Amino acid sequence: MTLLATLALAMQAAAALPSRGCGKSLSSGNYTLSHAGVTRHYRLFVPTGYRANTASPLVVAFHGWGGNENEFLGNASVRAASNRHGYIVVAPRGLGAGAPDRSYNSWTFSGSATGLDGDGLNPAVSGDTDAICDARSTPDYRYPSCKNPARPVASNTCSWTQCRADDVAFTRALLARIGRSLCVDTSRVFATGGSNGGMFVWELGQNTRSSPLFRAIAPVIGLPHRGYLAPPGRSQPLPVLLITGTQDTTVPPGPWENPGFTTTSNGSDRFFYTGATAITRVWSKANGCGLGTAAPFDDGVAATDCRTYCAGFSSWPRVLDCRASMGHDYGLPWSWNLVLEFFNRS
């Protein structure tokens, strides 16, 4: 067994690490948090089986572009499954709908605000630029906060998320708030998100400021922009479940075993993304797995085709690439059940 595998098993076997909020209770509902001079909003779900002196696992769920805190928790099946598995769920709202941007609520991750890709001028791409999109075929979505002359962030018109706040820092503050308010098992904190929220979840896993806070992550129909192929931002393994749609023209996963990047082809945009195979291979290697041909894995969900480079390490692999015959859709409720099952096994 490799050192990484040993560390993973040790993490799984570790006892609960109760937060400072043990002994306290809080009702499900809508709350606010002032962070870096900005009022942030979030919805909280507390399972009926919550006990103030028993540490519970926590999931942070990030909505997609233009969504809000009700995107996941407004779904009855999400609440029912979370209740059944005993998960506290917090769903924050991104920035963008209010002043000064008056655009779509969003989460900012590598390249999304600057408009710059992670691999610069790619010699393998004819006529390539260093942008995350083909600006000739993509509308200008730049937020006013990204065009502020006093602090310009956007390098081109491919920029498409907010520039008002550091979302990684906000996530850290949100987790600290929940940990002070409820009895959270800090060794079992997880992140998931859909579309833009899923892209931000990759950022949380790659960023050294946030990666150590999570036990596992599960991006849904969300991939990093092209060239942002960083492994987990910590030395210990970080399990990941990736769920994508093979008919998705907005954030396509690309063909199996193809390490190339993918391109939006929905008729309105041409954004470039890291392919599902490319990012899962990088994370598989970081998690101590080999890089042969991905092996099939039965996740118990008829709708999905799941494959992994991490077969044989445990009953559930640490990196799992699941694709369903669907478009740019979350696949609720089956995807939420799968996400929680993956978290249970991580």
Question: PLM ranges: what are they?
Answer:
Residues 334-346:
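Catalytic active-site module of serine/aspartate enzymes centered on a nucleophile-bearing elbow/loop
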Residues 50, 211-316, 326-329:
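The feature captures the conserved acid-bearing segment of alpha/beta-hydrolase catalytic domains
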Residues 12-58, 70-76, 84-88, 156-159, ...:
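A domain-start/cap signature at the N-terminus of enzymes
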Residues 61-64, 91, 243:
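Structural cue for short, hydrophobic secondary-structure segments
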Residues 48-55, 109-196, 211:
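Gly/Ser-rich "nucleophile elbow"/oxyanion-hole loop immediately N-terminal to the catalytic nucleophile
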Residues 1-16:
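Fungal secretory targeting signals
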Residues 86-97:
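Conserved alpha/beta-hydrolase
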Residues 60-62, 220, 324:
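Alpha/beta-hydrolase
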